Amino acid sequence: MKISIGLGKEGVEERLAERGVSRRDFLKFCTAIAVTMGMGPAFAPEVARALMGPRRPSVVYLHNAECTGCSESVLRAFEPYIDTLILDTLSLDYHETIMAAAGDAAEAALEQAVNSPHGFIAVVEGGIPTAANGIYGKVANHTMLDICSRILPKAQAVIAYGTCATFGGVQAAKPNPTGAKGVNDALKHLGVKAINIAGCPPNPYNLVGTIVYYLKNKAAPELDSLNRPTMFFGQTVHEQCPRLPHFDAGEFAPSFESEEARKGWCLYELGCKGPVTMNNCPKIKFNQTNWPVDAGHPCIGCSEPDFWDAMTPFYQN
């Protein structure tokens, strides 16, 4: 079976117009990505140029040990909605959850994508089980460890999407019987150096922003010591939090049902991990609408290594 990889009309603008998406809406999306990247609205035309080539970027999305919450974060996104993102902006050539193909046809699509002369970007969701030669996780009778070991070294760029893929996440919580690891820990012997987009779930704008940066610069963005892009993970949640003035004033909510909590006082005494968590949640929010602290819940430190072990109990500081 021959499957079209990364092809379309002249460019993304024409494909979007055919689907009723205006240039204005497309530039609005590009502006949101530019702001997420810390470049400001003036950078939106550069984002547009990176996405408007005649060939859409081919993306291979692999699933390992996970709950599919990271995929849900993309599927629930708007501006653009997921159909616009995967049909007109990117060429998502393999994604087990949403692809139409199944069985042998799905495997054929994967093989064609990873062997395309035009190359591909790999996005990985979920921790990689490594114990007992990876026997705890299989797809199409191949261990997830074997699949990632075979495919990821071929990719032009590898993006570990979500805390399970970056640091092991809940899959690696003690006692971790499956030996689950993040991509870089599991495959460092193969020279794989994934860009880590941490979060449980991660923000889809951080994923698209990373892809845009790579398309424009043909290189990974500046990374911190944990391989996270500093344009998204360069500050703590605490430093960007709208409740920071209350922290500085020593005004802490004593309980969730208190009047102080309703007034927006700091949630540090209720377990907020914002001071030790690097992420841009207060800046971009989810769907540019809300994020946990604005909704009255403490940050649980989900974008940090070992957060299921190191950050619990969640409601103690």
Curated annotation (Swiss-Prot):
Q: Where does [4Fe-4S] cluster 1 bind?
A: C67, C70, C164, C200
Briefly, what is this protein's role?
Catalyzes the reversible oxidoreduction of molecular hydrogen, in conjunction with a specific electron acceptor, cytochrome c3.
**Which gene carries the instructions for this protein?**
hydA
Query: What is the recorded name of this protein?
Result: Periplasmic [NiFe] hydrogenase small subunit
Task: Give the classification, highest ranks.
Answer: Bacteria, Pseudomonadati, Thermodesulfobacteriota, Desulfovibrionia, Desulfovibrionales
Per UniProt, the enzyme's principal EC class comes to: oxidoreductase
Do you know which NCBIfam families this protein is assigned to? hydA, TAT_signal_seq
Cofactors that this protein relies on: [4Fe-4S] cluster; [3Fe-4S] cluster
Q: Which GO terms describe its molecular function?
A: 3 iron, 4 sulfur cluster binding; 4 iron, 4 sulfur cluster binding; cytochrome-c3 hydrogenase activity; electron transfer activity; ferredoxin hydrogenase activity; metal ion binding
Q: List the subcellular locations.
A: Periplasm
